[in-house]
Design a protein with these regions (language model features):
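Short amphipathic alpha-helical segments
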Residues: 17-18, 45, 70-72, 108-109, ...
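Short beta-strand-loop/turn "lid" adjacent to the catalytic site in phosphate-handling enzymes
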Residues: 49-96, 101-114, 131, 270-274
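Active-site nucleophile and cofactor-binding loops and adjacent substrate-binding regions
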Residues: 32-35, 74-76, 95-101, 121-124, ...
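ATP-binding/phosphotransfer module of carbohydrate and carboxylate kinases, centering on a glycine-rich
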Residues: 1-52, 171-322
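ATP-dependent carbohydrate kinase catalytic cores
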Residues: 93-124, 217-232, 239
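Glycine-rich phosphate-binding loop of actin/hexokinase-like ATP-binding domains
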Residues: 117-120, 125-185, 274, 280-296
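Short, acidic Gly/Pro/Ser/Thr-rich loop/turn segments
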Residues: 13, 64-66, 137-141, 195, ...
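Short glycine-aspartate micro-motif
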Residues: 3-7, 56-58, 95, 129-133, ...
Length: 322
């Protein structure tokens, strides 16, 4: 069976063509495109070319999916509708799923995971699993056992209110409020890294060398690399980011008690392992006011190293759930 899978984010669209029998997969072709302003259909047509034997397609999208329809959060595309995509692309079955649902399915169905463990915890096989990841935005999902597998559910938890409990982060919150209500994604994301840097540059360390990080094509990634190279403002920026990320993950852990594991997806964590391992993430993760930290110390916490989890999850969903 020929399956088309896509992972559509605010920055890039990844597409792949896979031959699968539901258990084994053979990737025939894989491409990455800038998401841009054209919409999904032109990108898929460009990718498929003359290929007309695709039976199923599953697209993982960075936004809420309701009734197989989705308006992607960080893209100017019109709403995507699976029924219309079936007609326009001449594909028999099309499903739209949240990108973190796709990531979740790949995590629960993939036997050979590539992980870095931040906290061993005490794994419980029948407990929920939580997934959180920062990139262009902040995504969250959770999974619960169902038979001999799991069922994955989406959330829009990245849009929870940012509620810091230390003075510096509260000053950051006040700074960001100039542009309206502040959700966690405004801080824990690639654009969030840039905003933290600007806050420190403008309000805390105006005499420090700011370098040319903000003029780079991906300033968030440039700032993270600057931190690794010892640049002061970048180091301070990433310290705030990692603490906020840990706190957001801890909030999720308090809600779901994911003793089946909390998995950190997305390129930012995978590309900044040393920053994630320095102890500040886990310290913020377990520091939850009236919640005994011993409880959250029992949650296994892992970084997922494969940054194509969403794409592979869309393949698995098409092969096993459609």
């Amino acid at each position: 069976m020929l399956v088309l899978a896509g992972d559509i984010g605010g920055t890039n669209t990844r597409l792949c063509l896979v031959e699968t029998d539901g258990k084994n997969e053979s990737t025939l072709r894989e491409e990455i495109y800038p998401s841009g302003n054209e919409g999904l259909v032109p990108l898929v047509r460009q990718f498929l070319g003359d290929e007309c034997n695709v039976y199923k397609a599953c697209f993982a999208l960075a936004g809420p999916v309701l009734n197989n329809k989705c308006k992607i959060t960080n893209l100017p595309w019109p709403e995507l509708d699976a029924a219309k995509l079936q007609e326009e692309l001449n594909i028999a079955k099309v499903s739209l799923i949240n990108d973190f649902v796709a990531i979740g399915y790949n995590i629960v169905l993939e036997k050979n995971k590539s992980l870095v463990t931040l906290q061993e915890g005490e794994f419980l096989p029948d407990a929920p699993i939580a997934i959180i990841g920062a990139g262009t935005g902040l995504g969250k999902a959770f999974a619960v056992p169902e038979g001999d597998s799991y069922r994955v559910f989406p959330t829009e938890g990245g849009h929870e209110s940012f509620a810091p409990d230390n003075l510096l982060a509260q000053e950051l919150l006040a700074y960001l409020r100039a542009d309206g209500k502040v959700d966690v994604e405004r801080v824990v994301s690639g654009p969030g890294i840039v905003d933290i840097f600007r806050f420190l540059q403008d309000h805390k360390f105006p005499s420090e060398d700011a370098g040319d990080f903000l003029s780079q094509s991906d300033p968030g990634a440039a700032i993270a690399k600057g931190a690794a190279a010892g640049h002061f403002l970048c180091q301070q920026t990433m310290a705030i980011f990692v603490e906020a990320f840990g706190a957001a993950a801890g909030d999720m852990a308090v809600s779901f008690l994911p003793f089946g594991g909390l998995y950190i997806a997305g390129g930012i964590a995978a590309q900044n392992i040393e920053l994630m391992q320095n102890g500040n993430f886990i310290k913020a993760f377990t520091d939850k006011a009236r919640v005994n930290p011993v409880l959250l110390e029992k949650v296994p916490v892992h970084i997922v190293l494969n940054t194509l989890e969403g794409l592979r999850g869309a393949v698995k969903y098409a092969a096993t759930k459609m």
